Amino acid sequence: MSAHVRQTQPFRWDGIEVKPYKSEGAHFAGITRQLLFAGGDGLGCELRYFEVAPGGWSSLERHHHAHAVMLVRGRARVLVGNRLVDAETHDLVRVPPLTWHQVQTAGDEPLGFLCMVDCDRDTPERPDAEALAALRADPAVAEFIKV
């Protein structure tokens, strides 16, 4: 990657491909990703930009690595463990390791967020029936989650 990559239009960068969020599945909707920094040259982490259309959501998942998220566009409702967080532009959200999490748009405009993760990370795990039952024990969480 060049030392400087120009933004070509809002939330789009020269030479950075807009990709599907994940390769397949119905456990997410209306979300794309862009890999802004791939972690080479000793960086040790990746910086990704995710964009979620109004009414969209990420997958409900957990993994051994942490996430550091900064909203840069729109508003979100975020599940972190068993807590629902309302976040807006420039808010920070930390997702600790092995914590169930899901992001959903809140409002009529797209949601955009930067997500920093370690380059060396594991594959996300989706909840099994037992984990879903535990999450759904809280009525607010049960109403929120989409699988």
List where the protein language model places each region:
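A short, N-terminal "cap"/entry segment at the start of jelly-roll beta-barrel domains
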Residues: 1-44, 128-147
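Conserved short histidine dyad/triad with adjacent acidic residue
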Residues: 47-63
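A short hydrophobic beta-strand segment most commonly corresponding to one strand
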Residues: 49, 94, 108-126
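A generic "binding-loop/recognition-motif" signal
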Residues: 56, 64-65, 83, 99-100, ...
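Short beta-strand His + acidic residue motifs that chelate non-heme Fe in jelly-roll/DSBH
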Residues: 58-60, 78-79, 95, 101-107, ...
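Glycine- and acidic-residue-biased ligand/ion/polar-headgroup-sensing regions
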Residues: 65-67, 71-76, 81
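Short acidic-glycine-tyrosine-enriched beta hairpin
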Residues: 82-98
